[in-house]
Amino acid sequence: MMAKQVVVLLALLLLLPIVTASMGDASGRTGRIYMYGTSIQDLFRYLQLDYQRNVFLLRFLLGRGGLLLH
């Protein structure tokens, strides 16, 4: 159980620079990553999920056919 949480946290740490870099780009060159990054952040904000449910949702999104990479 603990190993899964570590893997999820590592995946989140790897995705954060991509999301933040794309959000800082006003030209729209990284449109796809920007779209997925903001949609996930908005989803967390609107649902007001706690940390464990955020990790579960992130694991779900990453596990379903690589949603973030398409």
From Swiss-Prot:
Gene Ontology MF: a single term: toxin activity
GO cellular component, one term: extracellular region
Keywords from the named record: Ion channel impairing toxin, Neurotoxin, Secreted, Signal, Toxin
Keyword RNA-binding: no
Secretion signal span: 1-21
Residues that make up the propeptide removed upon maturation: 22-32
Principal location: secreted
Keyword Signal included in the entry's annotation: yes
Biological role: Acts as a neurotoxin by inhibiting an ion channel.
Subcellular location: Secreted
Lineage, broadest ranks: Eukaryota, Metazoa, Spiralia, Lophotrochozoa, Mollusca
Misc: The mature peptide does not contain cysteine residues.
Tissues expressed in: Expressed by the venom duct.
Species of origin: Iotyrris olangoensis
Protein name (Swiss-Prot/TrEMBL): Turripeptide OL179
